[in-house]
Protein backbone atom coordinates (compact mmCIF):
# COMPACT_ATOMS: atom_id res chain seq x y z
CA UNK A 1 0.00 0.00 0.00
CA UNK A 2 2.85 2.44 0.69
CA UNK A 3 4.28 1.76 -2.76
CA UNK A 4 1.35 3.66 -4.30
CA UNK A 5 2.73 6.84 -2.77
CA UNK A 6 5.47 6.48 -5.40
CA UNK A 7 3.54 4.87 -8.25
CA UNK A 8 0.02 5.48 -9.50
CA UNK A 9 -0.71 1.88 -10.49
CA UNK A 10 0.71 -1.60 -11.15
CA UNK A 11 1.52 -0.76 -14.75
CA UNK A 12 3.75 2.12 -13.70
CA UNK A 13 5.59 -0.23 -11.32
CA UNK A 14 5.98 -2.80 -14.11
CA UNK A 15 7.31 -0.21 -16.56
CA UNK A 16 9.74 1.12 -13.94
CA UNK A 17 11.11 -2.37 -13.33
CA UNK A 18 11.54 -2.92 -17.07
CA UNK A 19 12.92 0.55 -17.85
CA UNK A 20 16.60 -0.54 -17.98
CA UNK A 21 15.96 -3.28 -20.56
CA UNK A 22 13.60 -1.05 -22.54
CA UNK A 23 16.27 1.65 -22.64
CA UNK A 24 18.86 -0.83 -23.91
CA UNK A 25 16.52 -2.26 -26.55
CA UNK A 26 15.57 1.18 -27.83
CA UNK A 27 19.24 2.17 -27.89
CA UNK A 28 19.71 -0.66 -30.42
CA UNK A 29 17.11 0.99 -32.67
CA UNK A 30 18.67 4.42 -32.41
CA UNK A 31 22.16 3.10 -33.08
CA UNK A 32 21.20 2.56 -36.74
CA UNK A 33 22.35 5.94 -38.05
CA UNK A 34 23.76 5.91 -41.58
CA UNK A 35 25.54 9.20 -40.90
CA UNK A 36 27.57 7.51 -38.17
CA UNK A 37 28.29 4.24 -40.00
CA UNK A 38 30.25 3.13 -43.00
CA UNK A 39 29.81 0.20 -45.35
CA UNK A 40 32.29 -1.63 -43.15
CA UNK A 41 29.41 -2.38 -40.80
CA UNK A 42 28.87 -5.37 -43.11
CA UNK A 43 32.49 -6.53 -43.21
CA UNK A 44 34.34 -5.29 -40.13
CA UNK A 45 34.99 -8.07 -37.62
CA UNK A 46 35.45 -5.54 -34.79
CA UNK A 47 31.96 -4.19 -35.38
CA UNK A 48 30.58 -7.73 -35.47
CA UNK A 49 32.33 -8.57 -32.19
CA UNK A 50 30.85 -5.41 -30.63
CA UNK A 51 27.40 -6.61 -31.70
CA UNK A 52 28.03 -10.01 -30.16
CA UNK A 53 29.07 -8.38 -26.89
CA UNK A 54 26.00 -6.11 -26.90
CA UNK A 55 23.68 -9.12 -27.11
CA UNK A 56 25.61 -11.00 -24.42
CA UNK A 57 25.45 -7.95 -22.15
CA UNK A 58 21.75 -7.47 -22.85
CA UNK A 59 20.87 -11.04 -21.88
CA UNK A 60 23.35 -11.26 -19.00
CA UNK A 61 22.26 -7.98 -17.41
CA UNK A 62 18.54 -8.25 -18.09
CA UNK A 63 17.60 -11.95 -18.17
CA UNK A 64 14.83 -11.57 -15.55
CA UNK A 65 13.54 -8.33 -17.09
CA UNK A 66 13.56 -9.86 -20.58
CA UNK A 67 11.59 -12.82 -19.25
CA UNK A 68 9.01 -10.45 -17.77
CA UNK A 69 8.85 -8.35 -20.94
CA UNK A 70 8.66 -11.25 -23.39
CA UNK A 71 6.50 -13.69 -21.41
CA UNK A 72 4.67 -11.85 -18.61
CA UNK A 73 3.54 -8.50 -20.03
CA UNK A 74 -0.06 -9.53 -20.77
CA UNK A 75 -2.54 -7.02 -19.39
CA UNK A 76 0.06 -4.26 -19.16
CA UNK A 77 0.79 -1.33 -21.42
CA UNK A 78 3.74 -3.39 -22.71
CA UNK A 79 1.73 -6.41 -23.87
CA UNK A 80 2.22 -5.35 -27.51
CA UNK A 81 5.85 -4.35 -27.03
CA UNK A 82 7.23 -6.99 -29.39
CA UNK A 83 5.08 -5.94 -32.35
CA UNK A 84 5.52 -2.21 -31.62
CA UNK A 85 9.30 -2.63 -31.36
CA UNK A 86 9.38 -4.73 -34.53
CA UNK A 87 7.47 -2.02 -36.40
CA UNK A 88 9.78 0.70 -35.07
CA UNK A 89 12.89 -1.29 -35.97
CA UNK A 90 11.51 -2.00 -39.46
CA UNK A 91 10.96 1.73 -40.08
CA UNK A 92 14.40 2.58 -38.67
CA UNK A 93 16.20 -0.01 -40.82
CA UNK A 94 14.37 1.25 -43.91
CA UNK A 95 15.57 4.81 -43.20
CA UNK A 96 19.06 3.47 -42.40
CA UNK A 97 19.18 1.69 -45.77
CA UNK A 98 18.12 4.89 -47.55
CA UNK A 99 20.94 6.79 -45.83
CA UNK A 100 23.46 4.08 -46.70
CA UNK A 101 22.27 4.18 -50.35
CA UNK A 102 22.99 7.92 -50.46
CA UNK A 103 26.53 7.29 -49.21
CA UNK A 104 27.07 4.14 -51.30
CA UNK A 105 24.97 4.35 -54.50
CA UNK A 106 25.88 0.81 -55.60
CA UNK A 107 24.02 -0.75 -52.66
CA UNK A 108 20.83 -2.63 -53.40
CA UNK A 109 18.21 -1.51 -50.90
CA UNK A 110 15.27 -3.05 -52.75
CA UNK A 111 14.60 -5.34 -49.80
CA UNK A 112 11.01 -5.91 -48.77
CA UNK A 113 9.71 -4.39 -45.57
CA UNK A 114 8.48 -7.84 -44.62
CA UNK A 115 12.00 -9.29 -44.78
CA UNK A 116 13.28 -6.46 -42.57
CA UNK A 117 10.32 -7.10 -40.24
CA UNK A 118 11.13 -10.81 -40.14
CA UNK A 119 14.74 -10.07 -39.25
CA UNK A 120 13.56 -8.29 -36.09
CA UNK A 121 11.20 -11.16 -35.29
CA UNK A 122 14.25 -13.46 -35.45
CA UNK A 123 15.97 -11.18 -32.95
CA UNK A 124 13.13 -11.78 -30.49
CA UNK A 125 13.32 -15.52 -31.13
CA UNK A 126 17.03 -15.36 -30.30
CA UNK A 127 16.36 -13.40 -27.10
CA UNK A 128 13.53 -15.73 -26.06
CA UNK A 129 15.69 -18.81 -26.50
CA UNK A 130 18.58 -17.27 -24.57
CA UNK A 131 16.22 -16.28 -21.74
CA UNK A 132 14.44 -19.65 -21.59
CA UNK A 133 17.57 -21.80 -21.75
CA UNK A 134 20.42 -21.12 -19.39
CA UNK A 135 23.13 -21.13 -22.02
CA UNK A 136 26.64 -20.91 -20.62
CA UNK A 137 28.42 -17.66 -21.42
CA UNK A 138 30.97 -19.39 -23.71
CA UNK A 139 28.18 -21.12 -25.63
CA UNK A 140 26.21 -17.88 -25.77
CA UNK A 141 29.25 -16.08 -27.20
CA UNK A 142 29.67 -18.75 -29.90
CA UNK A 143 25.97 -18.91 -30.71
CA UNK A 144 25.56 -15.14 -30.98
CA UNK A 145 28.74 -14.86 -33.06
CA UNK A 146 27.27 -17.46 -35.43
CA UNK A 147 23.99 -15.53 -35.56
CA UNK A 148 25.75 -12.22 -36.29
CA UNK A 149 27.99 -13.84 -38.95
CA UNK A 150 24.95 -15.46 -40.60
CA UNK A 151 22.96 -12.23 -40.46
CA UNK A 152 25.85 -10.11 -41.76
CA UNK A 153 26.60 -12.49 -44.63
CA UNK A 154 22.93 -12.39 -45.60
CA UNK A 155 22.74 -8.60 -45.63
CA UNK A 156 25.99 -8.42 -47.61
CA UNK A 157 24.54 -10.73 -50.24
CA UNK A 158 21.16 -8.99 -50.43
CA UNK A 159 22.67 -5.51 -50.61
CA UNK A 160 25.52 -6.35 -53.01
CA UNK A 161 28.17 -5.08 -50.60
What are these regions (language model features)?
Residues 22, 42-64, 121, 125, ...:
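Amphipathic alpha-helical segments that line or abut small-molecule/effector binding pockets
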Residues 10, 39-44:
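Sequence-specific DNA-binding recognition helix
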Residues 1-12, 16:
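Helix-turn-helix
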Residues 24-35, 65, 122-130:
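Solvent-exposed, amphipathic alpha-helical segments
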Residues 30-31, 54-61, 76-102, 113-124:
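Amphipathic alpha-helical packing segments from all-alpha helical-bundle domains
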Residues 35-41, 69-76, 105-108:
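Short linear capping/connector segments at secondary-structure termini
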Residues 12-35, 46, 50-54, 80, ...:
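Alpha-helical structural segments
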Residues 67, 100-150, 158-161:
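Hydrophobic/aromatic-rich alpha-helical bundle segments in the mid-to-C-terminal region
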Amino acid sequence: SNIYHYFTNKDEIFRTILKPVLNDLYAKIYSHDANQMSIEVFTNSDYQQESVQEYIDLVSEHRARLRMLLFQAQGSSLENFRSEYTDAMTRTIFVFFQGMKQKYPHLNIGITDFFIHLNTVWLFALLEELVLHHVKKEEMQKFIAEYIAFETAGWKELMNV
